[in-house]
């Protein structure tokens, strides 16, 4: 049984036979995608406060050091992103900052907000005003928290990471796989197009990798809301010196993801963290969000590739490369979007023209 599922009343039955079948998949068993896509974004770390202290993560700052982005910085970053042709405002923060972060909560109160999710809603409003579509990844969320911001997001996300307990999540506030799965379920119940994924190399074994992918598949089969699954290797940084998975591991687990998931769910590898050129024959069809404006605030030591580098990956694979929105096309076509997001895409302005050009033709009118 997946740890924590009882506490959240999540019934997921994954048979040993299904796991064994998936474990038998190798790269030569899957087909390469016929095209690759990517999304142009700006990365906005709303706060670096987090109740977790994962040993592989450099994103969080301890109490007394964590900060909040102010409204002016959010607006200016979004404006720069729109000028650079970005379509996505990627908002992140550490999972719901706990009571240790007194300065963060005091600042939120001074700005007129009772919670970080209230501030996230205002940040999403700013992004829409500046011509970007919000995609929020605020970690674990309750139904109430997600419902408070879902209508102002084109899509949302949280990494499942793994279905097992690992030492890298250790400590008094360890991540709970059941709680992560509950967030995926809440997104499905609320009809939110959703991004999730697994972390490779944090202490899980092959059984857990297969189980994690099959758990994601089961959630998608119930609600149809998973738009992409990220296969992300853990990478070395100032807090993690435990090594990264080798190429053979990444090729095998990527192929397993492609085999486990239905065709409409994209398989993505982050091109600043994974050897994308060596994984195109393993079933990936997306290269994730990259930014011409901001750094990867979760992995700041690993620079985003330039568009020319993504083009080179596609050319090496002999497939076309196209740009996409932060919500995948079929969710737009099938009526998953909220009224504010639909209005932004249909707007008679530069942002609306940019969104529709990408949606209709995969081409951004703003060149880099």
From Swiss-Prot:
<comment type="function">
    <text>Catalyzes the radical-mediated synthesis of 7,8-didemethyl-8-hydroxy-5-deazariboflavin from 5-amino-5-(4-hydroxybenzyl)-6-(D-ribitylimino)-5,6-dihydrouracil.</text>
</comment>
<feature type="binding site">
    <location>
        <position position="57"/>
    </location>
    <ligand>
        <name>[4Fe-4S] cluster</name>
    </ligand>
</feature>
<comment type="pathway">
    <text>Cofactor biosynthesis; coenzyme F0 biosynthesis.</text>
</comment>
<dbReference type="GO" id="GO:0005506">
    <property type="term" value="F:iron ion binding"/>
</dbReference>
<dbReference type="InterPro" id="IPR006638">
    <property type="entry name" value="Elp3/MiaA/NifB-like_rSAM"/>
</dbReference>
<dbReference type="InterPro" id="IPR013785">
    <property type="entry name" value="Aldolase_TIM"/>
</dbReference>
<keyword id="KW-0408">Iron</keyword>
<dbReference type="GO" id="GO:0016765">
    <property type="term" value="F:transferase activity, transferring alkyl or aryl (other than methyl) groups"/>
</dbReference>
<dbReference type="InterPro" id="IPR034405">
    <property type="entry name" value="F420"/>
</dbReference>
<dbReference type="InterPro" id="IPR019939">
    <property type="entry name" value="CofG_family"/>
</dbReference>
<keyword id="KW-0949">S-adenosyl-L-methionine</keyword>
<comment type="subunit">
    <text>Consists of two subunits, CofG and CofH.</text>
</comment>
<keyword id="KW-0479">Metal-binding</keyword>
<dbReference type="GO" id="GO:0044689">
    <property type="term" value="F:7,8-didemethyl-8-hydroxy-5-deazariboflavin synthase activity"/>
</dbReference>
<feature type="binding site">
    <location>
        <position position="50"/>
    </location>
    <ligand>
        <name>[4Fe-4S] cluster</name>
    </ligand>
</feature>
<dbReference type="InterPro" id="IPR007197">
    <property type="entry name" value="rSAM"/>
</dbReference>
<dbReference type="GO" id="GO:0051539">
    <property type="term" value="F:4 iron, 4 sulfur cluster binding"/>
</dbReference>
<comment type="similarity">
    <text>Belongs to the radical SAM superfamily. CofG family.</text>
</comment>
<keyword id="KW-0004">4Fe-4S</keyword>
<keyword id="KW-0411">Iron-sulfur</keyword>
<feature type="domain" description="Radical SAM core">
    <location>
        <begin position="36"/>
        <end position="272"/>
    </location>
</feature>
<keyword id="KW-0456">Lyase</keyword>
<protein>
    <recommendedName>
        <fullName>7,8-didemethyl-8-hydroxy-5-deazariboflavin synthase</fullName>
        <ecNumber>4.3.1.32</ecNumber>
    </recommendedName>
</protein>
<dbReference type="Pfam" id="PF04055">
    <property type="entry name" value="Radical_SAM"/>
</dbReference>
<feature type="binding site">
    <location>
        <position position="54"/>
    </location>
    <ligand>
        <name>[4Fe-4S] cluster</name>
    </ligand>
</feature>
